[in-house]
Amino acid sequence: MSEERKTKTDAAAPASAALQRIDRKDAFLQALHTFLTAHQGTEWAVAAVDIQHFKLYNELYGTEKGDALLETVANCLLGYSKQTGYPAGYFGNDDFFLCLPDEKAEQTAVLATLQACMAAGRQDVTFFVVMGVCPVQANPGADAATLCNYAQIAGVTTGSGYLHRFEPTMLNELKEQQQLLGELE
């Protein structure tokens, strides 16, 4: 195992097989940068995977079941990464990322696979997977971390459905919300 891979774990992460194998933030950002550099000219997207109501799930059923759910998502993403060769990563908490083609059909299929993987963990609390997608070619000059941030912003956008595509107007809305909050303080 390389030194980079050995250092990708952190104290806050639960110790489990898939969560130990999936790239952590720094390793994922490097892998994403390398992948996108090697595959220029192809339409790619960065996706942020968010487990809605995860904190509530953890509080109601305990961290052991929460960790098992995270393990399931990591395992599912590792399977996709192994099958396709596209990078996948885990930034801690319930924040997962992956690179995939900028094709809605592929993104919808990945989302459906994630939802199916998580179905066994469902209890009385409704939770689901939301995926925010940031198209790489629509954001020229954005580095790997910025692409992940944009995907994450898209993932928390309210609206119908479970697949949200990043639009630059989302940044303006976020800035306006932060300004309003600042004025309230």
Residue spans for each PLM region:
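Short, low-complexity N-terminal regulatory "tails/caps" that precede and couple sensory modules
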Residues: 1-20, 163
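Catalytic core regions of nucleotide second-messenger enzymes
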Residues: 85-92, 116-132
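Conserved acidic
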Residues: 1, 50-53
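Short beta-strand-to-loop capping motifs
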Residues: 98-103, 135-138
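Alpha-helical scaffold within the catalytic cores of cyclic-nucleotide enzymes
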Residues: 74-78, 106-124
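Catalytic/regulatory signature loops of cyclic-dinucleotide turnover enzymes
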Residues: 122-128, 145-183
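A structural signal for short, well-ordered beta-strand segments
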Residues: 46, 96, 129-133
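Conserved long alpha-helical elements within nucleotide-processing catalytic cores of c-di-GMP signaling
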Residues: 12-45, 52-78, 89-93, 97, ...
